[in-house]
């Protein structure tokens, strides 16, 4: 299959889908959805006390457990990304305080009311239709110059995936 994607600005982009492409819906979520044992990705701003203040929290589908596990710089200046398993969660003055663990360590994350919380749910190719908001995490340039991807995120319930 092939998709023609209209970008906000710039030329349309054609992307081929691998035979085993994974499609994930991106849906609204809340703090109540952050359960102990959930695998999450948190884009955050480091705080002076060493904790991380969440900007965005993505709750992964169980089939995505382990994706990008660890702690590293994120795509915004001065920010970090932590993909890890929720160990504990406690209500705090500034929001929910969540401790996450990954293979090389753990982080304390503060999730305030201003954090965007979304969840991935398993989807299928039928969701890839004209007008759908999508995000492609990674596309490979093929020898003939075309792009190919094995994963697409598609917004549901008004969500525009990033």
Predicted features and spans:
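Short, flexible, surface-exposed loop segments at domain boundaries
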Residues: 1-162
């Amino acid at each position: 299959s092939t998709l023609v994607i209209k970008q906000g600005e710039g030329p349309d982009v054609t992307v081929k889908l691998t035979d085993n492409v994974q499609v994930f819906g991106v849906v609204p979520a809340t703090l109540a959805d952050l359960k102990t044992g959930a695998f999450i990705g948190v884009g955050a701003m480091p705080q002076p006390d060493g904790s991380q203040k969440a900007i965005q929290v993505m709750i992964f589908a169980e089939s995505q457990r382990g994706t990008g596990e660890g702690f590293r710089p994120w795509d915004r200046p001065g920010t970090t990304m932590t993909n890890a398993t929720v160990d504990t969660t406690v209500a705090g003055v500034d929001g929910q305080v969540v401790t996450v663990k990954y293979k090389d360590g753990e982080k304390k994350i503060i999730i305030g009311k201003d954090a965007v919380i979304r969840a991935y749910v398993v989807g299928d190719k039928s969701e890839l239709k004209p007008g759908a908001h999508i995000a492609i995490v990674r596309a490979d340039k093929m020898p003939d110059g075309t792009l190919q991807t094995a994963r697409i995120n598609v917004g549901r319930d008004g969500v525009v995936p990033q």
